[in-house]
Amino acid sequence: MSEKKINLLDLDRKAMRALFADLGEKPFRADQLMKWIYHFGVSDFEEMTNINKVLRQKLAARCEIVAPEISSYQKSADGTIKFAIHVGEGQEVETVYIPEDDRATLCVSSQVGCALECTFCSTAQQGFNRNLTVSEIVGQIWRVSHFLGFAKDTGERPITNVVMMGMGEPLLNLANVIPAMDIMLDDFGFSLSKRRVTLSTSGVVPALDKLGDALDVALAVSIHAPNDELRDILVPVNKKYPLQEFLAGIRRYIAKSNANRGRVTVEYVMLDHINDSTEQAHELAQLMKDTPCKVNLIPFNPYPGSPYGRSSNSRIDRFSKVLMEYGLTVIVRKTRGDDIDAACGQLAGDIRDRTKRLAKKRMQENQISVTMN
């Protein structure tokens, strides 16, 4: 049996240079190769004209450059594109491209499904199968860049921002997320500014500390409730890492971060008559008083079977005004791609659920139905 080839999309620059040392080559050759892969989108070693033929042959014998394929895509009326990315075993994750006047953002997934069980999120209802590999994470960017068109003559890429806000909890896949983000930030990788790469987390505090020790990117935190009692229901990981513990971890992260410019982005989904009262707005402002932040209010995006409704514009406006009375910067997120189920909280993919979460939920619903009848 032939030896399995090394997928170069799995290697950050440190690992790539180690490979080249093993091949008896100088470190700058690894930098050249990364530039071909990430600046120009090249996957055929024979096209890498500044790498000598002998080395190209060595690489072809031991290595490959393989990104997951796009299975299908849908385009929204607002220009948002949702991609279904095939990751093997009949499974798909979803990646969303969001074009704007001054930027083009790609929302990237980190897990097949999600290991957490946030009750307002479609991904969480699908269950969880596994973590994505480095190549499956950066491969989403690489593949969508191909779809949009690498500028092979200049090396200019069509994606300016990446947000780790797709399917999954990134901090539960740090072993792959950190090298993937290293590649995003690397001058020889996707060459993105650390302020243009954002990781969103629901609050796995020990992993947040590890992230802070490893690299500096913009941080968004999923709060969604102003107290532990409600957050235990909406974001069950709160039972393990309650709000004050999470906020302390956030403060530790931004204290040593340049990417965040001294404050974090708080994400707060607006659920009708669940977490959107004026009293809860006052409570949220008090909660965040010692944690420098801006607040991103996210109108809830319904999905089939969701137990929640979207807050009315008047309730969102009233909530926002209360927060601003405390001097907080508040942004109401513009919903993008909801007509193709590509908006925040709507990503589902195609998952073989190892947790049996969806099956258990259906069983419980059937039991309730039988009892009521």
UniProtKB/Swiss-Prot annotation:
| Superkingdom of origin organism | Bacteria
> What Enzyme Commission number(s) apply to this enzyme?
2.1.1.192
A matching Pfam family: RlmN_N
UniProt keyword annotations, A-Z: 4Fe-4S, Cytoplasm, Disulfide bond, Iron, Iron-sulfur, Metal-binding, Methyltransferase, rRNA processing, S-adenosyl-L-methionine, Transferase, tRNA processing
Q: Where is the active site?
A: 94 (proton acceptor), 344 (s-methylcysteine intermediate)
Tell me the residue numbers annotated for binding [4Fe-4S] cluster. Answer: 114, 118, 121
Details of cofactor binding: Binds 1 [4Fe-4S] cluster. The cluster is coordinated with 3 cysteines and an exchangeable S-adenosyl-L-methionine.
The Gene Ontology terms for molecular function here are: 4 iron, 4 sulfur cluster binding; metal ion binding; rRNA (adenine(2503)-C2-)-methyltransferase activity; rRNA binding; tRNA (adenine(37)-C2)-methyltransferase activity; tRNA binding
Q: Please write the reaction equations for the catalytic activity of this protein.
A: adenosine(2503) in 23S rRNA + 2 reduced [2Fe-2S]-[ferredoxin] + 2 S-adenosyl-L-methionine = 2-methyladenosine(2503) in 23S rRNA + 5'-deoxyadenosine + L-methionine + 2 oxidized [2Fe-2S]-[ferredoxin] + S-adenosyl-L-homocysteine; adenosine(37) in tRNA + 2 reduced [2Fe-2S]-[ferredoxin] + 2 S-adenosyl-L-methionine = 2-methyladenosine(37) in tRNA + 5'-deoxyadenosine + L-methionine + 2 oxidized [2Fe-2S]-[ferredoxin] + S-adenosyl-L-homocysteine
Q: Which cofactor does it need?
A: [4Fe-4S] cluster
Q: Which cysteines are joined by disulfide bonds?
A: 107-344
Residue ranges occupied by any Radical SAM core domain in the UniProt entry: 100-339
A biological process (GO) annotation for this entry?
A: rRNA base methylation
Matching entries from InterPro entries are given as: Aldolase_TIM, Methyltransferase_A, RlmN_N, RNA_MTrfase_RlmN, rRNA_lsu_MTrfase_RlmN/Cfr, rSAM
Binding residue positions for S-adenosyl-L-methionine: 168-169, 200, 222-224, 301
What CDD domains does its record include?
A: Radical_SAM (cd01335)
Other known facts: Reaction proceeds by a ping-pong mechanism involving intermediate methylation of a conserved cysteine residue.
> What HAMAP family does this protein map onto?
RNA_methyltr_RlmN (MF_01849)
Q: What does this protein do?
A: Specifically methylates position 2 of adenine 2503 in 23S rRNA and position 2 of adenine 37 in tRNAs. m2A2503 modification seems to play a crucial role in the proofreading step occurring at the peptidyl transferase center and thus would serve to optimize ribosomal fidelity.
Protein name (database record) = Dual-specificity RNA methyltransferase RlmN
Q: Which organism is it from?
A: Shewanella sp. (strain MR-4)
- Gene symbol here is rlmN
